[in-house]
Amino acid sequence: MDQLAHHYRAHIAELNRRVAEILSREALSGLVIHSGQPHRMFLDDINYPFKANPHFKAWLPVLDNPNCWLVVNGRDKPQLIFYRPVDFWHKVSDVPDMFWTEYFDIKLLTKADKVAEFLPTDIANWAYLGEHLDVAEVLGFTSRNPDAVMSYLHYHRTTKTEYELECMRRANQIAVQGHLAAKNAFYNGASEFEIQQHYLSAVGQSENEVPYGNIIALNQNAAILHYTALEHQSPAKRLSFLIDAGASYFGYASDITRTYAFEKNRFDELITAMNKAQLELIDMMRPGVRYPDLHLATHAKVAQMLLDFDLATGDVQGLVDQGITSAFFPHGLGHMLGLQVHDVGGFSHDERGTHIAAPEAHPFLRCTRILAPNQVLTMEPGLYIIDTLLNELKQDSRGQQINWQTVDELRPFGGIRIEDNVIVHQDRNENMTRELGLTD
């Protein structure tokens, strides 16, 4: 924890600097950041799992306590209003006592509806950041999630501090252990549900603590991009395994994908080719490179694989231009990663929030930024046999370029995706996922 504590001082200083700058521009007194409130299930007395406001957890790793507030102005010591009710029904969060607490003036709130007593008196000139706009209105905030403030903060959140980078390394390190356990479970005959349990046990996190719902897909289920069904029975014939799963550390996410073949076969060779292509794409990352250009380069590599593995005929550029590669690789190459899995700022051209949309032919690309030092992105090329997309090719002349026999042979395997988490440095790329032990 010493290294985190060392970096945390500079992290808080940077957050304060950002706040002071945007407050000066917008003539605001400060920001009041709400951790959030519990959400009650309809007609029930049970709450949905609580997820803290990412703007809140950017400052400190309080992840599971609703009704907390931060009062920051970039100059004074940030104030943390920490919720500790008198409650014999539920576990009450302990008063924080970690390395980060010295940077906050901590006040204890026992009743959520009494928070106004702790807030600034000139509340009308402070901006509320959070989800519960009705609460903000009752409290007297006239500025609620102002666009200028949000755009500025989102743009700069893509540049990670050293503290944030260390948290993300640790999130990767944890997830790698889960992936290794899941891989072993797959080769030992486990079902999707059982593989999930092996993964969660290895990372030491519950389904509500990992940053997103794990994708644990055997055989043809790997063709479903966001498959989360978890079959309890093992398939009669074990062919392939795609796992897309991450872990959390102090509110920061990892997001890693691997694909395995149960036996050495043509599909296994396709995985090897995709792995090689993914590493080549990562080698192309550097400051000044446009992320959409990397996405287009991915389509060229997918086109070459379609030709090499007798899935299609023609030439590389023609397969890309006709949209044939998009039927096999329909999603974007990757996205910003940080406090959120699909982190904010991926389309922001500047501090004002100027939006740079994805190319018209590639609407699902989640990042159009120019790469810069200390950004963290996923790199996740894929190739799938998705019948709904391939059937569209059959409707016109493009279907004549597809080798449907090869498609039929590969369909039971579902698809391939390989995803690493990469830090862009000034003079190199840091592939956290591989460097921390997930080499294949």
From Swiss-Prot:
EC number per UniProt: 3.4.13.9
Cofactor remark: Binds 2 manganese ions per subunit.
Pfam families linked: PepQ_N (PF21216), Peptidase_M24 (PF00557)
Catalytic activity: Xaa-L-Pro dipeptide + H2O = an L-alpha-amino acid + L-proline
GO molecular function: aminopeptidase activity; metal ion binding; metalloexopeptidase activity; phosphoric triester hydrolase activity; proline dipeptidase activity
Residues annotated as signal peptide: none
Claim: Hydrolase is one of the keywords in the record: yes
PROSITE patterns: PROLINE_PEPTIDASE (PS00491)
Residues annotated to bind Mn(2+) 1: D255, H335, E380, E419
CDD domains noted in UniProt: Prolidase
GO cellular component: cytosol
Source species, domain of life: Bacteria
Cofactor: Mn(2+)
Family: Belongs to the peptidase M24B family. Bacterial-type prolidase subfamily.
Protein purpose: Splits dipeptides with a prolyl residue in the C-terminal position.
Stated name of the protein: Xaa-Pro dipeptidase
Chain's gene name: pepQ
